UniProtKB/Swiss-Prot annotation:
It comes from the Bacteria. Pfam families: Ribosomal_L18p. One of its GO terms (molecular function) is structural constituent of ribosome. HAMAP family: Ribosomal_uL18_B. This is Large ribosomal subunit protein uL18. Keywords: Ribonucleoprotein, Ribosomal protein, RNA-binding, rRNA-binding. The keyword Membrane does not apply. Belongs to the universal ribosomal protein uL18 family. CDD domains: Ribosomal_L18_L5e (cd00432). Gene3D superfamilies: 3.30.420.100.
Amino acid sequence: MSRAKVTNARRKQRVRLSLRRSAGGRPRLSVFRSSKHIYAQVIDDQKGETIASASSMEKEMRSAGNTGADIDAAKAVGKLLAERAVKAGIKEVVFDRGGYLYHGRVKALADAARESGLSF
């Protein structure tokens, strides 16, 4: 494995470990970022099920003209995910940035989710 992959894997493992310690039964908002799209889901780790999810690949996102690889798409995904989670009765989550730095698209998604009703 390359040094960058090892560093990213260690960062992801470190973030997940700290989340497990501080979760307190709250669901986890997990973010995955690829070069073309961004995905987010609210997961209940105790039951092992996904409560709500959203991605930039959904029809309503693509029809709005978002490419998926920019900050505007991340904001739209965060807003959509928060609306779905609040509708499912979830208001508090733990933010799992998945080893990604809290910057750019990840930060935009988190800020949009906060503005739309999720607290973390």
